[in-house]
Structure formats: structure tokens, C-alpha cells
């Protein structure tokens, strides 16, 4: 009751059961919305997918990051999510002081290069925005015709993610 919305930070690389296949697999591509929908189901509050990304060149090419962002942004939209925010706007590789120089993994995640030119992921976001604007920003809410009952055990996330992926096939 203290919050209007909840948030998730769904990185496939750090999520159990989501990283068993390539980032661009069905499981990898559905992970963000699956986590957010599970959060909504448990809390009864809308969920914002914030701080999502691919971890940049550490995990994949700029083109794969762009495709991942596009699929997930569309998925967030069609599944009625509150929003979808990429991490982050700018590269941090030119910031040679703490905390930015502590972890090489976190330095090249931006939508813009250090010179502020667009990376392919920024172009994907523009395409998604233009498509949504052209189609109209609202779509019918999906009907829920099944639920996943959680027992509260250590493998709940495995069951949630597996059930969500199966429901989309």
C-alpha cells in the first residue's frame, strides 16, 4: 500500500533459469515481462520494467542489443506494462573515476556513444515509439485464462518463468 508501482531490474545474465539459453532465445526474450507480470500478480500493483539491458559488448554485439531492446519494448507494450527503461542513456567508458571505473562490465551500456551519436539500440527505441504512435498507444488488455500457483519454495522463479514461456508458445 506504500507504493503506486513496483519495479524489476531483469537482466537475463544474472537471473536463475533465464540464462540457460542465448539472450535471443524465447526464454531470454520473455524474461523481462515474465518477471514484471509475476511481480504484478503477487503485489497487485503495476510494474515498471526499469534498468534492463544486455550488458553491452560483454555479452553481445550492438546489433543484438538493439534487437533485444526492440522485442522487449514491444513485449512490454503489448503486455500492458507501466513502462520499459533501458540502462542507461550514456556510455560511461570515459568516466575515469569511482564508481564508474570499478567494473568494466558497466561501462558500455548506454544508448549513446561517448560522442553522443546513437547506438543501434537508440534507433530501436525510436522505431518502437514511432510504431506505437502510428498504431495508437492503447491496445486491449489480455485475458487471463490460467494462473500459476506458487508453493513458496526455492524454485518458484523457475516455475514462473517456465510457465510464462509455455503460455506464450
Where do the model's predicted regions map?
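Carbohydrate-binding surfaces of carbohydrate-active enzymes
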Residues: 40-169
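Glycoside hydrolase catalytic-domain groove-lining segments
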Residues: 1-59, 91, 130
Amino acid at each position: 500500500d506504500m507504493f503506486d508501482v513496483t519495479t524489476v531490474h531483469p537482466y537475463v545474465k544474472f537471473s536463475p533459469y533465464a540464462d540457460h539459453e542465448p539472450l535471443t532465445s524465447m526464454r531470454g526474450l520473455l524474461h523481462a515481462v515474465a518477471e514484471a507480470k509475476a511481480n504484478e500478480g503477487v503485489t497487485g500493483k503495476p510494474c515498471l520494467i526499469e534498468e534492463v539491458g544486455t550488458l553491452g559488448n560483454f555479452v553481445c554485439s550492438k546489433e543484438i542489443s538493439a534487437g533485444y531492446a526492440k522485442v522487449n519494448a514491444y513485449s512490454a507494450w503489448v503486455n500492458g506494462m507501466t513502462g520499459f527503461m533501458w540502462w542507461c542513456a550514456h556510455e560511461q567508458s570515459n568516466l575515469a573515476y569511482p564508481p564508474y571505473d570499478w567494473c568494466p562490465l558497466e561501462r558500455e551500456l548506454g544508448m549513446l556513444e561517448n560522442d553522443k551519436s546513437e547506438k543501434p539500440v537508440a534507433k530501436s527505441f525510436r522505431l518502437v515509439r514511432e510504431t506505437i504512435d502510428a498504431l495508437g498507444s492503447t491496445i486491449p488488455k489480455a485475458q487471463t485464462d490460467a494462473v500459476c500457483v506458487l508453493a513458496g519454495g526455492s524454485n518458484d522463479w523457475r516455475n514462473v518463468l517456465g510457465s510464462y514461456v509455455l503460455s506464450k508458445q
